[in-house]
Curated annotation (Swiss-Prot):
InterPro entries: Membr_insert_YidC (IPR019998), Membr_insert_YidC_N (IPR028053), YidC/ALB3/OXA1/COX18 (IPR001708), YidC/Oxa/ALB_C (IPR028055), YidC_ALB_C (IPR047196), YidC_periplasmic_sf (IPR038221). One of its GO terms (cellular component) is plasma membrane. CDD domains: 5TM_YidC_Alb3, EcYidC-like_peri. The chain crosses the membrane at residues 7-27, 332-352, 411-431, 449-469, 488-508. This is Membrane protein insertase YidC. Interacts with the Sec translocase complex via SecD. Specifically interacts with transmembrane segments of nascent integral membrane proteins during membrane integration. GO terms for molecular function: membrane insertase activity. Required for the insertion and/or proper folding and/or complex formation of integral membrane proteins into the membrane. Involved in integration of membrane proteins that insert both dependently and independently of the Sec translocase complex, as well as at least some lipoproteins. Aids folding of multispanning membrane proteins. Its main location: membrane. GO terms for biological process: protein insertion into membrane; protein transport.
Length: 536
Protein backbone atom coordinates (compact mmCIF):
# COMPACT_ATOMS: atom_id res chain seq x y z
CA UNK A 1 0.00 0.00 0.00
CA UNK A 2 1.53 3.36 -1.04
CA UNK A 3 0.98 6.78 0.53
CA UNK A 4 -1.58 7.94 -2.02
CA UNK A 5 -3.60 4.81 -1.49
CA UNK A 6 -3.38 5.42 2.26
CA UNK A 7 -5.03 8.80 1.72
CA UNK A 8 -7.75 7.08 -0.29
CA UNK A 9 -8.34 4.48 2.42
CA UNK A 10 -8.40 7.19 5.11
CA UNK A 11 -10.93 9.17 3.11
CA UNK A 12 -13.19 6.19 2.51
CA UNK A 13 -13.02 5.22 6.18
CA UNK A 14 -13.90 8.78 7.21
CA UNK A 15 -16.86 9.00 4.85
CA UNK A 16 -18.06 5.55 5.91
CA UNK A 17 -17.81 6.55 9.57
CA UNK A 18 -19.84 9.74 9.05
CA UNK A 19 -22.49 7.98 6.96
CA UNK A 20 -22.81 5.22 9.57
CA UNK A 21 -23.11 7.81 12.34
CA UNK A 22 -25.91 9.60 10.49
CA UNK A 23 -27.61 6.26 9.73
CA UNK A 24 -27.70 5.54 13.44
CA UNK A 25 -29.42 8.88 13.98
CA UNK A 26 -32.06 8.25 11.32
CA UNK A 27 -32.69 4.48 11.40
CA UNK A 28 -32.06 3.23 14.93
CA UNK A 29 -33.37 -0.37 15.13
CA UNK A 30 -36.72 -0.85 16.81
CA UNK A 31 -36.42 -1.69 20.48
CA UNK A 32 -38.16 -4.48 22.33
CA UNK A 33 -41.43 -3.35 23.89
CA UNK A 34 -41.24 -2.95 27.65
CA UNK A 35 -43.95 -3.62 30.19
CA UNK A 36 -45.80 -0.41 31.02
CA UNK A 37 -46.71 0.64 34.53
CA UNK A 38 -50.48 0.50 35.02
CA UNK A 39 -50.78 3.38 37.46
CA UNK A 40 -48.19 5.64 35.82
CA UNK A 41 -50.65 7.62 33.73
CA UNK A 42 -53.14 7.64 36.61
CA UNK A 43 -50.90 9.27 39.24
CA UNK A 44 -48.55 11.62 37.37
CA UNK A 45 -49.98 14.72 35.65
CA UNK A 46 -49.69 14.30 31.90
CA UNK A 47 -50.02 16.29 28.70
CA UNK A 48 -53.41 17.75 27.90
CA UNK A 49 -55.06 17.73 24.49
CA UNK A 50 -52.92 20.23 22.62
CA UNK A 51 -49.55 21.90 22.95
CA UNK A 52 -51.30 25.26 23.27
CA UNK A 53 -53.45 23.93 26.07
CA UNK A 54 -50.34 22.69 27.87
CA UNK A 55 -48.77 26.11 27.56
CA UNK A 56 -51.88 27.82 28.88
CA UNK A 57 -52.18 25.36 31.75
CA UNK A 58 -48.55 25.73 32.74
CA UNK A 59 -48.44 29.53 32.59
CA UNK A 60 -51.81 30.57 33.95
CA UNK A 61 -50.40 30.85 37.46
CA UNK A 62 -48.26 33.69 38.70
CA UNK A 63 -44.60 33.47 37.67
CA UNK A 64 -41.52 34.40 39.65
CA UNK A 65 -37.91 34.86 38.54
CA UNK A 66 -34.91 33.45 40.38
CA UNK A 67 -31.48 34.56 39.21
CA UNK A 68 -27.95 33.51 40.15
CA UNK A 69 -24.73 34.59 38.46
CA UNK A 70 -25.05 31.89 35.75
CA UNK A 71 -28.70 30.83 35.74
CA UNK A 72 -32.08 32.52 35.54
CA UNK A 73 -35.22 30.46 36.22
CA UNK A 74 -38.83 31.38 35.61
CA UNK A 75 -41.08 29.36 37.92
CA UNK A 76 -44.85 29.01 37.72
CA UNK A 77 -46.33 29.24 41.21
CA UNK A 78 -49.11 26.90 40.07
CA UNK A 79 -47.33 23.62 40.76
CA UNK A 80 -43.88 25.18 41.06
CA UNK A 81 -42.78 24.08 37.58
CA UNK A 82 -39.67 25.55 35.93
CA UNK A 83 -40.97 26.87 32.63
CA UNK A 84 -37.88 28.80 31.54
CA UNK A 85 -34.14 28.61 32.18
CA UNK A 86 -31.69 31.14 30.78
CA UNK A 87 -27.99 30.24 30.78
CA UNK A 88 -26.44 33.63 31.45
CA UNK A 89 -22.88 32.58 30.56
CA UNK A 90 -23.93 31.22 27.15
CA UNK A 91 -25.24 33.44 24.36
CA UNK A 92 -28.20 32.34 22.23
CA UNK A 93 -26.07 32.90 19.13
CA UNK A 94 -22.69 34.36 18.33
CA UNK A 95 -24.12 37.73 17.32
CA UNK A 96 -26.75 37.88 20.07
CA UNK A 97 -26.55 39.55 23.47
CA UNK A 98 -29.42 37.43 24.79
CA UNK A 99 -28.60 34.41 26.96
CA UNK A 100 -29.34 30.94 25.66
CA UNK A 101 -32.82 29.83 26.66
CA UNK A 102 -32.80 26.12 27.46
CA UNK A 103 -36.13 25.41 29.15
CA UNK A 104 -38.83 27.39 27.39
CA UNK A 105 -42.49 27.63 26.39
CA UNK A 106 -41.78 29.88 23.40
CA UNK A 107 -42.43 28.03 20.14
CA UNK A 108 -42.11 24.60 21.75
CA UNK A 109 -42.64 22.88 25.06
CA UNK A 110 -39.52 22.22 27.12
CA UNK A 111 -40.21 22.39 30.85
CA UNK A 112 -39.23 20.71 34.12
CA UNK A 113 -42.12 19.69 36.36
CA UNK A 114 -42.06 18.27 39.87
CA UNK A 115 -44.66 17.66 42.52
CA UNK A 116 -46.41 15.31 44.91
CA UNK A 117 -48.95 12.72 43.77
CA UNK A 118 -50.42 9.62 45.41
CA UNK A 119 -53.23 9.17 47.94
CA UNK A 120 -52.91 12.66 49.47
CA UNK A 121 -51.01 14.26 46.61
CA UNK A 122 -51.50 17.97 45.91
CA UNK A 123 -50.75 17.65 42.17
CA UNK A 124 -53.47 15.90 40.16
CA UNK A 125 -55.08 15.96 36.73
CA UNK A 126 -57.71 18.27 38.16
CA UNK A 127 -55.27 20.89 39.37
CA UNK A 128 -51.88 21.76 40.78
CA UNK A 129 -50.89 23.25 44.11
CA UNK A 130 -51.16 27.09 44.06
CA UNK A 131 -48.01 28.04 45.95
CA UNK A 132 -47.52 31.39 47.66
CA UNK A 133 -44.29 33.40 47.59
CA UNK A 134 -43.13 36.56 49.33
CA UNK A 135 -41.83 38.34 46.22
CA UNK A 136 -41.73 38.11 42.45
CA UNK A 137 -37.98 38.35 41.88
CA UNK A 138 -35.07 36.73 43.72
CA UNK A 139 -31.45 37.61 42.88
CA UNK A 140 -28.19 36.24 44.22
CA UNK A 141 -26.52 39.20 45.90
CA UNK A 142 -22.81 39.95 46.04
CA UNK A 143 -21.17 37.98 48.80
CA UNK A 144 -23.89 35.32 48.76
CA UNK A 145 -22.99 31.77 47.79
CA UNK A 146 -26.57 30.58 47.37
CA UNK A 147 -30.11 31.84 47.10
CA UNK A 148 -33.02 29.98 48.72
CA UNK A 149 -36.56 30.44 47.40
CA UNK A 150 -39.35 28.87 49.50
CA UNK A 151 -42.90 28.49 48.11
CA UNK A 152 -45.68 27.48 50.50
CA UNK A 153 -49.11 25.88 50.23
CA UNK A 154 -51.42 24.72 53.03
CA UNK A 155 -54.23 22.20 52.68
CA UNK A 156 -56.22 20.25 55.30
CA UNK A 157 -53.86 21.18 58.08
CA UNK A 158 -50.72 20.22 56.18
CA UNK A 159 -48.10 22.83 55.24
CA UNK A 160 -46.16 22.10 52.05
CA UNK A 161 -42.99 24.08 51.31
CA UNK A 162 -41.34 23.64 47.93
CA UNK A 163 -37.86 25.15 47.98
CA UNK A 164 -35.47 25.99 45.13
CA UNK A 165 -31.81 26.53 46.03
CA UNK A 166 -29.39 27.98 43.47
CA UNK A 167 -25.65 28.09 44.16
CA UNK A 168 -23.14 30.54 42.78
CA UNK A 169 -21.51 29.33 39.57
CA UNK A 170 -23.65 26.19 39.42
CA UNK A 171 -26.39 24.85 37.15
CA UNK A 172 -27.34 22.27 39.77
CA UNK A 173 -30.61 23.37 41.41
CA UNK A 174 -31.71 21.72 44.66
CA UNK A 175 -35.49 21.17 44.75
CA UNK A 176 -37.00 19.95 48.02
CA UNK A 177 -40.42 19.40 49.57
CA UNK A 178 -40.86 20.01 53.30
CA UNK A 179 -44.11 18.51 54.56
CA UNK A 180 -45.31 19.60 58.01
CA UNK A 181 -48.33 17.52 58.98
CA UNK A 182 -50.29 19.50 61.58
CA UNK A 183 -53.44 17.45 61.01
CA UNK A 184 -54.76 14.48 62.98
CA UNK A 185 -54.42 12.15 59.99
CA UNK A 186 -51.51 10.26 58.47
CA UNK A 187 -50.92 11.29 54.86
CA UNK A 188 -49.21 9.54 51.95
CA UNK A 189 -47.55 11.32 49.05
CA UNK A 190 -45.25 10.27 46.22
CA UNK A 191 -42.71 12.68 44.68
CA UNK A 192 -42.12 12.90 40.95
CA UNK A 193 -40.03 14.93 38.56
CA UNK A 194 -40.39 14.98 34.80
CA UNK A 195 -39.17 16.82 31.74
CA UNK A 196 -41.53 17.61 28.88
CA UNK A 197 -40.33 18.33 25.36
CA UNK A 198 -42.10 18.75 22.04
CA UNK A 199 -41.40 15.81 19.75
CA UNK A 200 -38.70 16.88 17.32
CA UNK A 201 -36.40 15.26 14.80
CA UNK A 202 -32.70 15.38 15.55
CA UNK A 203 -31.12 18.59 14.31
CA UNK A 204 -28.01 16.80 13.14
CA UNK A 205 -26.64 16.42 9.63
CA UNK A 206 -23.91 14.39 7.95
CA UNK A 207 -21.20 16.87 8.96
CA UNK A 208 -22.49 17.34 12.50
CA UNK A 209 -24.72 14.45 13.64
CA UNK A 210 -26.21 15.42 17.00
CA UNK A 211 -28.77 13.89 19.31
CA UNK A 212 -31.94 15.45 20.71
CA UNK A 213 -33.88 13.09 22.95
CA UNK A 214 -34.06 11.35 26.29
CA UNK A 215 -31.55 9.44 28.38
CA UNK A 216 -31.45 7.75 31.75
CA UNK A 217 -29.19 6.09 34.29
CA UNK A 218 -30.12 3.19 36.53
CA UNK A 219 -28.46 0.70 38.84
CA UNK A 220 -28.24 -1.72 35.89
CA UNK A 221 -27.21 0.76 33.19
CA UNK A 222 -24.82 3.66 33.79
CA UNK A 223 -26.07 5.59 30.77
CA UNK A 224 -28.49 4.88 27.97
CA UNK A 225 -30.16 7.05 25.38
CA UNK A 226 -33.92 6.74 24.99
CA UNK A 227 -34.93 8.58 21.84
CA UNK A 228 -38.25 10.23 21.05
CA UNK A 229 -38.85 7.44 18.55
CA UNK A 230 -38.30 4.82 21.25
CA UNK A 231 -40.63 6.70 23.61
CA UNK A 232 -43.30 6.63 20.92
CA UNK A 233 -42.95 2.87 20.48
CA UNK A 234 -42.68 1.79 24.12
CA UNK A 235 -42.95 3.57 27.45
CA UNK A 236 -39.90 3.42 29.66
CA UNK A 237 -40.57 1.67 32.97
CA UNK A 238 -37.54 0.84 35.12
CA UNK A 239 -37.30 0.33 38.87
CA UNK A 240 -33.94 1.33 40.28
CA UNK A 241 -32.14 2.62 43.30
CA UNK A 242 -31.13 6.21 42.64
CA UNK A 243 -30.79 6.87 38.91
CA UNK A 244 -31.70 9.93 36.89
CA UNK A 245 -33.56 10.98 33.73
CA UNK A 246 -32.48 13.60 31.22
CA UNK A 247 -33.34 15.41 28.02
CA UNK A 248 -30.31 15.97 25.79
CA UNK A 249 -29.45 18.28 22.95
CA UNK A 250 -26.15 19.34 21.43
CA UNK A 251 -23.96 20.87 24.16
CA UNK A 252 -26.79 21.15 26.76
CA UNK A 253 -28.85 18.92 29.05
CA UNK A 254 -31.71 19.08 31.54
CA UNK A 255 -31.95 16.29 34.10
CA UNK A 256 -33.91 15.30 37.19
CA UNK A 257 -31.85 13.55 39.85
CA UNK A 258 -34.03 12.00 42.60
CA UNK A 259 -32.88 10.90 46.04
CA UNK A 260 -30.02 8.49 45.29
CA UNK A 261 -30.71 6.38 48.38
CA UNK A 262 -34.36 5.80 47.45
CA UNK A 263 -36.03 3.26 45.17
CA UNK A 264 -37.35 5.14 42.14
CA UNK A 265 -39.25 4.32 38.97
CA UNK A 266 -38.05 5.84 35.71
CA UNK A 267 -40.77 6.31 33.09
CA UNK A 268 -41.59 7.96 29.79
CA UNK A 269 -44.57 8.52 27.51
CA UNK A 270 -45.69 10.60 24.54
CA UNK A 271 -49.01 12.39 24.13
CA UNK A 272 -50.23 14.86 21.52
CA UNK A 273 -46.81 15.71 20.18
CA UNK A 274 -45.12 16.03 23.58
CA UNK A 275 -42.61 13.57 25.05
CA UNK A 276 -42.24 13.16 28.81
CA UNK A 277 -39.44 11.43 30.68
CA UNK A 278 -39.38 11.38 34.45
CA UNK A 279 -39.15 9.54 37.75
CA UNK A 280 -41.46 8.61 40.61
CA UNK A 281 -40.01 8.28 44.08
CA UNK A 282 -41.23 5.94 46.82
CA UNK A 283 -44.45 6.60 48.72
CA UNK A 284 -43.69 8.78 51.73
CA UNK A 285 -45.79 8.51 54.87
CA UNK A 286 -46.08 11.54 57.16
CA UNK A 287 -47.66 10.93 60.53
CA UNK A 288 -49.60 13.60 62.47
CA UNK A 289 -47.48 16.37 64.03
CA UNK A 290 -44.33 15.30 62.19
CA UNK A 291 -42.24 16.80 59.40
CA UNK A 292 -40.61 15.11 56.40
CA UNK A 293 -38.27 16.43 53.72
CA UNK A 294 -38.04 14.99 50.20
CA UNK A 295 -35.01 16.04 48.14
CA UNK A 296 -34.13 16.09 44.44
CA UNK A 297 -31.90 17.98 42.02
CA UNK A 298 -32.55 19.66 38.69
CA UNK A 299 -29.65 20.18 36.31
CA UNK A 300 -30.36 22.63 33.50
CA UNK A 301 -27.19 23.78 31.80
CA UNK A 302 -24.22 22.95 29.58
CA UNK A 303 -22.57 19.54 29.34
CA UNK A 304 -19.80 20.46 31.74
CA UNK A 305 -18.24 17.09 32.53
CA UNK A 306 -16.54 18.10 35.77
CA UNK A 307 -19.60 19.84 37.23
CA UNK A 308 -22.04 17.14 36.11
CA UNK A 309 -19.90 14.41 37.66
CA UNK A 310 -20.16 16.24 40.97
CA UNK A 311 -23.92 16.75 40.60
CA UNK A 312 -24.83 13.09 39.99
CA UNK A 313 -23.12 9.78 39.35
CA UNK A 314 -22.72 9.08 35.61
CA UNK A 315 -24.41 12.36 34.58
CA UNK A 316 -21.18 13.33 32.81
CA UNK A 317 -21.78 10.41 30.43
CA UNK A 318 -24.34 12.57 28.62
CA UNK A 319 -21.23 13.87 26.86
CA UNK A 320 -21.39 10.88 24.55
CA UNK A 321 -18.17 9.86 22.81
CA UNK A 322 -19.60 6.58 21.53
CA UNK A 323 -17.49 3.43 21.52
CA UNK A 324 -14.25 5.45 21.41
CA UNK A 325 -14.90 7.01 24.84
CA UNK A 326 -11.84 5.39 26.44
CA UNK A 327 -9.66 7.33 23.97
CA UNK A 328 -11.79 10.48 23.75
CA UNK A 329 -11.88 11.19 27.48
CA UNK A 330 -8.09 11.45 27.91
CA UNK A 331 -7.96 13.56 24.73
CA UNK A 332 -10.60 15.91 26.18
CA UNK A 333 -8.67 16.38 29.41
CA UNK A 334 -5.52 16.94 27.35
CA UNK A 335 -7.41 19.63 25.43
CA UNK A 336 -8.49 21.24 28.71
CA UNK A 337 -4.94 21.09 30.09
CA UNK A 338 -3.36 22.68 27.01
CA UNK A 339 -6.03 25.40 26.97
CA UNK A 340 -5.30 26.18 30.63
CA UNK A 341 -1.73 26.99 29.56
CA UNK A 342 -2.29 28.63 26.17
CA UNK A 343 -5.68 30.28 26.73
CA UNK A 344 -6.92 29.82 23.15
CA UNK A 345 -9.09 26.87 22.10
CA UNK A 346 -7.85 26.92 18.51
CA UNK A 347 -4.24 26.73 19.64
CA UNK A 348 -5.27 24.03 22.12
CA UNK A 349 -6.69 21.96 19.23
CA UNK A 350 -3.41 22.39 17.38
CA UNK A 351 -1.54 21.40 20.54
CA UNK A 352 -3.59 18.22 20.98
CA UNK A 353 -3.00 17.37 17.32
CA UNK A 354 0.75 17.86 17.73
CA UNK A 355 0.85 15.63 20.81
CA UNK A 356 -1.22 12.89 19.14
CA UNK A 357 0.78 12.97 15.90
CA UNK A 358 4.03 12.85 17.90
CA UNK A 359 2.83 9.81 19.84
CA UNK A 360 1.75 8.14 16.60
CA UNK A 361 5.03 8.92 14.84
CA UNK A 362 6.49 5.42 15.40
CA UNK A 363 3.40 3.93 13.72
CA UNK A 364 3.63 6.45 10.89
CA UNK A 365 7.31 5.70 10.38
CA UNK A 366 6.62 1.96 10.38
CA UNK A 367 3.84 2.50 7.83
CA UNK A 368 6.02 4.48 5.40
CA UNK A 369 8.99 2.15 5.85
CA UNK A 370 6.85 -0.89 5.11
CA UNK A 371 5.39 0.77 2.02
CA UNK A 372 8.88 1.69 0.81
CA UNK A 373 10.05 -1.91 1.18
CA UNK A 374 6.99 -3.10 -0.71
CA UNK A 375 7.78 -0.71 -3.56
CA UNK A 376 11.34 -2.05 -3.71
CA UNK A 377 9.93 -5.57 -4.04
CA UNK A 378 7.62 -4.72 -6.93
CA UNK A 379 10.02 -5.91 -9.69
CA UNK A 380 10.52 -9.28 -7.96
CA UNK A 381 6.78 -9.59 -7.30
CA UNK A 382 6.09 -8.87 -10.96
CA UNK A 383 8.50 -11.64 -11.95
CA UNK A 384 6.61 -14.08 -9.72
CA UNK A 385 3.30 -13.01 -11.26
CA UNK A 386 4.65 -13.63 -14.76
CA UNK A 387 6.21 -16.95 -13.78
CA UNK A 388 3.29 -18.41 -11.81
CA UNK A 389 0.41 -16.43 -13.29
CA UNK A 390 -1.63 -19.56 -14.01
CA UNK A 391 -0.90 -21.19 -10.64
CA UNK A 392 -2.23 -18.77 -8.03
CA UNK A 393 -1.56 -21.11 -5.12
CA UNK A 394 2.09 -21.54 -6.07
CA UNK A 395 2.42 -17.81 -6.73
CA UNK A 396 1.06 -17.02 -3.24
CA UNK A 397 3.48 -19.45 -1.64
CA UNK A 398 6.43 -17.92 -3.50
CA UNK A 399 5.33 -14.42 -2.54
CA UNK A 400 5.16 -15.38 1.13
CA UNK A 401 8.67 -16.85 0.87
CA UNK A 402 9.88 -13.59 -0.66
CA UNK A 403 8.23 -11.52 2.09
CA UNK A 404 9.85 -13.71 4.73
CA UNK A 405 13.23 -13.60 3.03
CA UNK A 406 13.17 -9.80 2.70
CA UNK A 407 11.58 -9.36 6.18
CA UNK A 408 8.63 -7.45 4.80
CA UNK A 409 5.10 -7.55 6.19
CA UNK A 410 2.63 -7.04 3.32
CA UNK A 411 0.11 -5.63 5.81
CA UNK A 412 2.69 -3.36 7.42
CA UNK A 413 1.52 -0.31 5.49
CA UNK A 414 -2.13 -0.90 6.26
CA UNK A 415 -2.17 -1.90 9.93
CA UNK A 416 -0.68 1.36 11.31
CA UNK A 417 -3.30 3.29 9.34
CA UNK A 418 -6.13 1.15 10.73
CA UNK A 419 -4.76 1.54 14.27
CA UNK A 420 -4.86 5.33 13.87
CA UNK A 421 -8.54 5.42 12.85
CA UNK A 422 -9.97 4.93 16.38
CA UNK A 423 -7.86 7.87 17.51
CA UNK A 424 -9.20 10.04 14.70
CA UNK A 425 -12.77 9.01 15.55
CA UNK A 426 -12.12 9.81 19.23
CA UNK A 427 -10.73 13.23 18.28
CA UNK A 428 -13.76 13.81 16.06
CA UNK A 429 -16.18 13.19 18.95
CA UNK A 430 -14.01 15.12 21.40
CA UNK A 431 -14.25 18.25 19.28
CA UNK A 432 -17.91 17.65 18.39
CA UNK A 433 -19.06 17.20 22.00
CA UNK A 434 -16.98 19.86 23.75
CA UNK A 435 -19.31 22.71 24.78
CA UNK A 436 -16.12 24.63 25.53
CA UNK A 437 -15.65 25.10 21.76
CA UNK A 438 -19.12 26.66 21.30
CA UNK A 439 -18.62 30.33 20.34
CA UNK A 440 -14.91 29.94 21.13
CA UNK A 441 -12.83 32.25 18.91
CA UNK A 442 -9.53 31.34 17.27
CA UNK A 443 -8.31 34.45 15.50
CA UNK A 444 -9.36 36.74 12.67
CA UNK A 445 -12.44 35.52 10.86
CA UNK A 446 -12.83 32.38 13.01
CA UNK A 447 -14.96 33.53 15.93
CA UNK A 448 -16.72 30.22 16.60
CA UNK A 449 -14.80 26.95 16.41
CA UNK A 450 -18.05 24.97 16.61
CA UNK A 451 -19.38 26.58 13.39
CA UNK A 452 -18.23 26.24 9.79
CA UNK A 453 -15.63 28.61 8.39
CA UNK A 454 -17.71 31.53 7.02
CA UNK A 455 -15.24 32.15 4.18
CA UNK A 456 -14.21 28.49 3.61
CA UNK A 457 -10.53 29.36 3.99
CA UNK A 458 -9.69 26.44 6.28
CA UNK A 459 -11.34 23.82 4.02
CA UNK A 460 -9.46 25.17 1.00
CA UNK A 461 -6.15 25.14 2.90
CA UNK A 462 -6.94 21.62 4.06
CA UNK A 463 -7.53 20.56 0.45
CA UNK A 464 -4.25 22.14 -0.63
CA UNK A 465 -2.41 20.32 2.15
CA UNK A 466 -3.89 17.02 0.92
CA UNK A 467 -2.81 17.87 -2.63
CA UNK A 468 0.73 18.58 -1.41
CA UNK A 469 0.79 15.28 0.48
CA UNK A 470 -0.20 13.48 -2.71
CA UNK A 471 2.54 15.19 -4.69
CA UNK A 472 5.14 14.23 -2.10
CA UNK A 473 4.01 10.61 -1.96
CA UNK A 474 5.31 8.00 -4.41
CA UNK A 475 2.65 6.07 -6.28
CA UNK A 476 2.64 2.63 -7.77
CA UNK A 477 -1.03 2.55 -8.65
CA UNK A 478 -1.62 1.41 -12.21
CA UNK A 479 -5.40 1.16 -12.15
CA UNK A 480 -6.84 4.24 -13.97
CA UNK A 481 -9.98 4.30 -11.81
CA UNK A 482 -7.97 4.40 -8.58
CA UNK A 483 -5.74 7.11 -10.02
CA UNK A 484 -8.75 9.27 -10.86
CA UNK A 485 -10.29 8.78 -7.43
CA UNK A 486 -7.02 9.69 -5.69
CA UNK A 487 -6.56 12.71 -7.94
CA UNK A 488 -9.97 14.07 -7.01
CA UNK A 489 -9.75 13.12 -3.33
CA UNK A 490 -8.47 16.57 -2.20
CA UNK A 491 -11.31 18.23 -4.10
CA UNK A 492 -13.88 15.83 -2.63
CA UNK A 493 -12.57 16.41 0.88
CA UNK A 494 -12.53 20.18 0.39
CA UNK A 495 -16.19 20.18 -0.61
CA UNK A 496 -17.03 17.73 2.16
CA UNK A 497 -15.34 19.87 4.82
CA UNK A 498 -17.02 23.13 3.77
CA UNK A 499 -19.79 22.48 6.30
CA UNK A 500 -17.67 20.95 9.04
CA UNK A 501 -17.06 22.86 12.29
CA UNK A 502 -13.97 25.01 11.80
CA UNK A 503 -12.37 23.44 14.89
CA UNK A 504 -12.50 20.01 13.28
CA UNK A 505 -11.16 21.34 9.97
CA UNK A 506 -8.38 23.06 11.93
CA UNK A 507 -7.47 19.69 13.43
CA UNK A 508 -7.38 18.02 10.01
CA UNK A 509 -5.35 20.87 8.48
CA UNK A 510 -2.87 20.81 11.36
CA UNK A 511 -2.62 17.04 11.12
CA UNK A 512 -1.87 17.24 7.39
CA UNK A 513 0.82 19.88 7.94
CA UNK A 514 2.49 17.78 10.63
CA UNK A 515 2.25 14.72 8.36
CA UNK A 516 4.00 16.66 5.58
CA UNK A 517 6.91 17.42 7.92
CA UNK A 518 7.00 13.86 9.25
CA UNK A 519 6.83 12.44 5.74
CA UNK A 520 9.73 14.61 4.62
CA UNK A 521 11.84 13.44 7.58
CA UNK A 522 10.96 9.78 7.03
CA UNK A 523 11.63 9.86 3.28
CA UNK A 524 14.97 11.61 3.84
CA UNK A 525 15.95 8.80 6.20
CA UNK A 526 14.73 6.15 3.73
CA UNK A 527 16.78 7.76 0.95
CA UNK A 528 19.91 7.26 3.02
CA UNK A 529 19.01 3.57 3.32
CA UNK A 530 18.31 3.28 -0.39
CA UNK A 531 14.62 2.54 0.16
CA UNK A 532 13.23 5.67 -1.43
CA UNK A 533 13.80 7.79 -4.51
CA UNK A 534 12.63 11.38 -4.34
CA UNK A 535 9.79 12.34 -6.68
CA UNK A 536 10.84 14.59 -9.53
Amino acid sequence: MNSNRSLLVMGLLLVSFLIFTQWQQDFNPEIQAQKQAQQQSRDVPHATNTANAITEHMTKGKTITVESDVLRLVIDTLGGDVIESDLLAHKASLDSTDPLKLLTTEGLIYTAQSGLVGKNGIDTHIGRAPYQVTQDHFTLAKGQNEIVVPMTFEQDGVMYTKTFTLKRGSYDVAVSFDIQNNSANTIEVQPYGQIKHSLLDSSGNLAMPTYTGGAYSSSETNYKKYSFDEMTKANLNIDTKGGWVALLQHYFVSAWVPNQDASNTLYSRTHNGVATIGYRGPITTVKPNTKTTITSQLWTGPKDQKEMAQAATHLELTVDYGWAWFIAKPLFWLLIFIHSIIGNWGLAIMGVTLVVKSLLYPLTKAQYTSMAKMRMLQPKLQELRERYGDDRQQMSQEMMKLYKQEKVNPMGGCLPLILQMPIFIALYWTFMEAVELRHAPFFGWIQDLSAQDPYYIFPVLMGLSMFLLQKMSPTAVADPTQLKVMTFMPVIFTVFFLWFPSGLVLYWLTSNCITIVQQWLIYRNLEKKGLHTRKK
